[in-house]
């Protein structure tokens, strides 16, 4: 077994603001709140959370990266971005203007990113989903959308000046992120003499939301990163330690009226055929295969996924890595069936909660979806399966059942999983998970069961507590088969105190 105990103490001294070091911003619509005024404080978290307005476009904008369409000129401007670094609380040195419009098919986001040094952009790659787009190594415009206004989960898009972008889903107020998710967004950028501009078009069918009559309110935030001066600024101001997808501190988007249904059913059939011929084969051999994937919206928050004779041939291959340790390598999930709403199936160490504690999902995770349909990196046929994932009010639910076929050295197996979490207070939840893996039609050494309970609690503002206990029951296994953790952290602008105890069995 292994255990770890960490205690960190960090005291941050605040320097008083210099007279005249800040200037007040122009008025911007905000939710009712007393002072302070945006742009006048050193503490970004002390600002009132902003509210912006989206408008319906009679004529949708042309997606070319230029914001010269009538739809953009008629839309209110989201501006007055505030720095999180290097000068927290100060107005951004480079102005950013964002507009949001929509029609019956799409949501549009347009941004003008003014720059006093146009062309001096830092870009690491033009590749889609390149990791530097979510680090501090490139100029970025970022969008985070909380479509249920639960202040916990979001869709995330990060875009560089050359139009390369990375997208994903975030869960549990930034505790978990999944960049394997691909939003069906379209992005165009354009260069100008005074900066660069970007247009984003997202189909309603690619988002989950409540398609009800009347006006909706969503959580929203924007990020502008100017890499040459290491400046990050946000529309809804955040502390330096907070990411764009910290939705509990995001602003609000209103004006979304009578949105269309996001689409209840999505069907993806496939058919494959192959022919082999040659003298060594002794003739011609022809084979064929068919299968089906289906997605059905049970409710605005719950999704049913079904698959028959699953085909993962279109999935990007893993990057080759060399393992010089005795522990197996962790590879991220890239198969669409498992990616969407993957946060509903998460149990284990969580990166955000363990800030400066050296833990992540790679240290301990009770469920790894890559154990289904893969054996030593080689595909195992999936006969059929289904899952239900999403939210119902304050409950988060994940249920999965998969049947794999027989493969050399491995019998046919059935995988069943149930995961529930209950939000007991804003930012606090308790939950449980049960997993069963069993051979079909007999016994096998792979049979096991796993189960656990966990809690993530936000107490008295800066104090956070997270804990879990989990165990496995594997055929033929001996020794300690449990894992446990307790962590607590108190963090504000002056104090950062963290403690962690964790034990993982054999």
Question: What role is predicted for each listed range?
Answer:
Residues 21-423, 428-432, 445:
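Structural preference for beta-rich elements and adjacent junctions enriched in aromatics
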Residues 194-197, 204, 285-315, 459-506:
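Repeat-solenoid scaffold signature
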Residues 314-334, 341-342, 346-351, 434-449, ...:
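Outer-membrane beta-barrel translocator/channel fold
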Residues 417-467:
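Extended hydrophobic/aromatic segments used for targeting, binding, or gating
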Residues 6-17:
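Bacterial N-terminal signal peptides
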């Amino acid at each position: 077994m292994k255990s770890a105990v960490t205690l960190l103490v960090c005291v941050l001294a605040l320097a008083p603001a210099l007279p005249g070091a800040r200037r007040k911003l122009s008025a911007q619509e905000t939710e009712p709140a007393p002072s302070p005024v945006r742009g006048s404080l050193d503490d970004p978290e002390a600002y009132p959370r902003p509210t912006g307005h989206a408008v319906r476009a009679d004529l949708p904008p042309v997606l070319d990266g230029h914001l010269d369409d009538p739809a953009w000129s008629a839309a209110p401007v989201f501006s007055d971005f505030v720095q999180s670094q290097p000068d927290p609380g100060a107005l951004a040195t480079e102005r950013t203007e964002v507009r949001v419009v929509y029609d019956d098919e799409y949501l549009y986001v347009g941004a003008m990113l003014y720059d006093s040094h146009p062309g001096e952009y830092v870009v690491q790659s033009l590749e889609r989903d390149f990791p530097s787009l979510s680090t501090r190594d490139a100029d970025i415009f970022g969008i985070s959308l909380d479509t249920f206004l639960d202040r916990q989960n979001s869709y995330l898009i990060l875009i560089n000046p050359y139009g390369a972008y990375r997208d994903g889903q975030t869960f549990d107020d930034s505790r978990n992120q999944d960049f394997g998710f691909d939003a069906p967004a379209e992005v165009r950028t354009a260069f100008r003499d005074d900066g660069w501009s970007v247009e984003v078009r997202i189909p309603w069918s690619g988002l989950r939301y409540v398609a009800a009559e009347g006006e909706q309110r969503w959580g929203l935030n924007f990020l502008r990163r100017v890499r040459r001066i290491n400046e990050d600024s946000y529309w809804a101001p955040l502390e330096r330690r907070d990411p764009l997808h910290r939705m509990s501190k995001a602003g609000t988007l209103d004006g979304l009226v009578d949105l269309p249904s996001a689409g209840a059913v999505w069907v993806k059939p496939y058919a494959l055929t192959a022919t082999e011929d040659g003298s060594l084969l002794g003739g011609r051999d022809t084979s064929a295969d068919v299968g089906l994937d289906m997605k059905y919206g049970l409710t605005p928050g719950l999704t049913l996924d079904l698959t028959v004779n699953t085909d993962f041939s279109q999935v990007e291959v893993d990057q080759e890595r060399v393992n010089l340790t005795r522990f197996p390598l962790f590879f991220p999930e890239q198969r669409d069936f498992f990616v969407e709403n993957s946060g509903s199936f998460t149990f284990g160490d969580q990166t955000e909660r363990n800030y400066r504690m050296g833990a992540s999902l790679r240290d301990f995770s009770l469920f790894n979806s890559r154990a289904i349909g893969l054996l030593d990196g080689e595909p195992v046929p999936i006969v059929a399966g289904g899952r239900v994932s999403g939210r119902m009010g304050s409950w988060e639910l994940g249920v999965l059942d998969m049947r794999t076929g027989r493969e050399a050295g491995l019998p046919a197996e059935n995988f069943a999983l149930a995961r529930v979490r209950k939000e007991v207070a804003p930012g606090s939840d308790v939950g449980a998970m049960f997993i069963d893996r069993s051979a079909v039609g007999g016994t096998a050494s792979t049979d096991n069961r796993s189960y656990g309970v966990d809690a993530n609690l936000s107490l008295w503002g800066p104090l956070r507590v997270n804990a879990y206990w989990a165990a496995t029951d594997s055929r033929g296994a001996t020794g300690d088969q449990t894992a446990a953790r307790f962590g607590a952290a108190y963090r504000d602008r002056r104090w950062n105190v963290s403690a962690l105890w964790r034990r993982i069995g054999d």
